A protein has these predicted regions:
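PLD/PLD-like phosphodiesterase catalytic module centered on the HKD motif
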Residues: 2-7, 21-24, 33-210
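A ubiquitous short alpha-helical element
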Residues: 28-29
């Protein structure tokens, strides 16, 4: 990015890593083990508050793994409040979707294919003013509370739309390589059925070349 504030934040972050001093206040970047966890928890609660107010709520996240207990509890609470949640979790996931009264508004899918997936994208509807964030952090205890990780906003509307379409909606539409996590912890492979087959990774290869 060429955004001056994010560049300044990155400079301050590396200064902190290479020296001693108090926790720094960054303008745009969220960083663990300091602000990332609390701010993302607040964003989940904000979606729940919108849902309780009858405004709906929507969360989409693409990560490699999920086992941090307070995040799982917050997602369960958001689901109970009426927030629709889609999680694209490539690997281990301790959350259980589709449990009545707990997580019936949460869907989890895993996609493993040709790509070594490492993009982490968090999307919040924010009452019709969507926020798109990219991060180095999975939703694990070690990433959010024990390591230095970063999370930064995609401010440019065109770039945010591209990330939403290619990294999120594209993968939510996959019906050939996706596996749906069930409430009992098992996975059920998606099938096209009457729909046209769609492979998220193949779509990107066809768009950008193999």
């Amino acid at each position: 990015t060429a955004e001056p504030e994010i560049g300044e934040d990155a400079h301050l972050l590396f200064m902190q890593l290479s020296g001693l001093g108090p926790v720094i206040n960054l303008k745009q970047i969220l960083h663990s083990p300091f602000t990332l966890h609390s701010q993302l928890m607040a964003k989940i609660e904000r979606e729940a508050a919108f849902a309780r107010a009858g405004k709906g709520g929507r969360i989409i996240a693409k990560i490699n793994a999920l086992n941090e207990s307070s995040v799982i509890s917050a997602l369960y609470a958001a689901s109970c409040a009426g927030v629709t949640i889609d999680l694209i979790v490539r690997g281990a996931c301790s959350l259980r979707p589709g449990i009545p009264g707990v997580s019936e508004n949460i869907r989890v899918r895993s996609i493993v294919g040709r790509f070594l997936e490492h993009s982490r994208v968090y999307w919040f509807n924010n009452d019709g003013n969507p926020e798109t964030w990219c991060s180095s952090a999975d939703w694990l205890y070690r990433n959010r509370l024990r390591r230095v990780e970063t999370c930064f906003p995609i401010r440019d509307p065109k770039l945010a739309s591209r990330v939403h379409e290619e990294a999120l909606q594209n993968y939510l539409s996959d019906n050939t390589q996706a596996w749906h996590l069930q409430a009992d912890g098992s996975y059920l492979r998606a099938t096209p059925g009457a729909q046209a087959p769609h492979c998220a990774q193949l779509a990107l290869l066809e768009k950008y070349g193999s």
